[in-house]
Amino acid sequence: MSDSVNGYANGYANGLSENEIGESTKKIKILFYATHPSQPIGYGKIGNTISNFLAAQSNVELYYFAISNFPGQTDETRYINPNIKFIDALAEDAAIGSSELYGVDIIDRVMREIKPDIFIIYNDIIVTSRLLNALLQYRQEFKDVTRFVSYVDLVYPFEKLRYIRHIDRNVDYFFAFSDFWKKNLIDMGVRADKVGIFYHGFDKHKFQIIPSEVAKEHFGFSTDDFIILNTNRNTYRKAHDISMKAFLELLRRERMDSRIKLFINHQMDSLSGYNIYDLLEVECLKLGLVYEDVLNKHVFMFKNKVGHAEDSQINMLYNAADVGVNTCLGEGFGLCSMEHAALGKPQVISSVGALTDIFKNGGSVLVKPKAVLSVANHVDEHNGDLHICDYNDFADGLQMYFHNSSKRKVDGYDIREHILNTYNWNTILVEFMKDLKKIL
């Protein structure tokens, strides 16, 4: 089975006839609900891989109910299998004068037109619950026709039980992102035999090792610069306040060493997160650092300053950075951290969610939370347990890697080998197909 330069268009989709869904003579209709595959966020990346794989199966007819297809944010370099039949939720709603972002008001019509054998929802519990509410009548009428599957994105342990139970009553099967989340679903009352694990895989076609010195030169860095990377988007859950405090504490300890630099790939001001400029300025004031020097000599970002970058740019950035940092309060999977680590770059990360599964065997620094809060309704409607780490612990991990290049190399090698062996799309997609066969 040969690999394809277009990712999973051919390399991981062909030669799997023994794992195809159902009987080879029957076309199985699948409606896949997810973020549009051209979007730069994790939902888009994973949706792209899954849909290309399914569309390449000889007995699958794939419909893609694509949400969040925002113009001006697409990665035009991504391969999209031409067999996929798209329903663009934003375009469909715009045509009827609706401001709905998730296609909830058109999902019943689409389901009745397609009558899929399997309906896969790849989203969080709020969007999933809204869709299921809109489909209660359909499910009652066509319960023997369509199997409902929730590929559920949980980010905090013990999210709102009312939503979990509602989804449990109205789907035939769950896919969890990792062992951590499968256990949490079971702890919340979902039957163990109703939950499978569908990991995110590492895309070895899109992300490949480039010599560090070449990547650093591309961004104008010196070979001996110590580049710290945070690619998380700017939302409260990603806790960029902790990242900024940890980075500035490292600068303070190292007397503003000119080699220490932070590259961030997200919006610098976000209503759902922080104004990064304000964070830096106030923390510099606390620590006695010169804000202008920090901003102009130690903090870097892409010129657009909004966090939208093509996969090729991200690949170059992963290779330029020496370590990654992720200070989140909860994590569904941690795709950016996993991808960066898979290129041999150790991470300093919160020990939360799926990150505890990915990095449990070493090769990086897992920072243990110091406090737990229940998420308030006004912060996030799905609630759950929010885990907070001490920024000093992240500063300790970053400082250790700054002073120990051999440790960086050893840890980078170890975590890369672990990820390549564990999060291999070949294996993951075959297991996914086996689980889908059980559902029919």
Which positions does each model-derived feature cover?
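Aromatic "clamp/platform" in nucleotide-sugar-dependent glycosyltransferases that forms part
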Residues: 329
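Carbohydrate-associated surface elements
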Residues: 180, 201
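Nucleotide-activated donor-binding/catalytic signature segment of Leloir-type glycosyltransferases, i.e.
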Residues: 274-316
